[in-house]
Amino acid sequence: MQQIEVKRLLVNYKTLEEFRNFREFGAAELSMKDDLEANIIENDSESPFYGIYFGGKLVARMSLYRIDGKYDRYFEPPQDYLELWKLEVLEPYRGKGFGRALVDFAKSFNLPVKTNARQRSNEFWTKMGFEPVTYQTDRDRGESPYVWYPEGVKEQLSEDEGSVETLEN
């Protein structure tokens, strides 16, 4: 297979139009159209959206947000980390390495990566080297959190309960 290149997507109306394909053919739960529209309105030039084009068509995409370490009570040692949201590959392009390429791109920053398994994707995240973590309502925005830990990083435990500390957003 040819080299897969992950690109930062521009926050503009062309990208919005490309996202409509995902809304039409993808899972409604994974729609990023509203997220992109909010970034256009806010004139946010630092796009959190990344994607892969195949044959001139956007076929895979995700949101990737860097969270400042000063807000981290999740990892030991506390540090910056990434939140990966709404990874989606259009149905005809699944099983071709596009999802793995997006995940590998996120891992290339060598920071912990948090995500939430949606659309029965638990097996995919496990295959990508992510570990399921216990869901906590005051910390996690989704009920099926998964984390990838780079070498030397582990989950931070509270001293009194032995449970995971919360992350306030």
Curated annotation (Swiss-Prot):
Identify the enzyme class.
transferase
So which domain of life are we looking at?
Bacteria
For this protein, the Enzyme Commission number is 2.3.1.-
Q: Which InterPro entries match?
A: Acyl_CoA_acyltransferase, GNAT_dom, YlbP
Which controlled-vocabulary keywords does the entry list? Answer: Acyltransferase, Transferase
Keyword Acyltransferase attached? yes
Entry's SUPFAM superfamilies?
Acyl-CoA N-acyltransferases (Nat)
Report domain N-acetyltransferase positions: 4-160
GO molecular-function term, one example from the UniProt record: acyltransferase activity, transferring groups other than amino-acyl groups
Q: What Pfam families does the record point to? A: Acetyltransf_1 (PF00583)
Can you name this protein? Uncharacterized N-acetyltransferase BH2580
Taxonomy of origin reads:
Bacteria, Bacillati, Bacillota, Bacilli, Bacillales
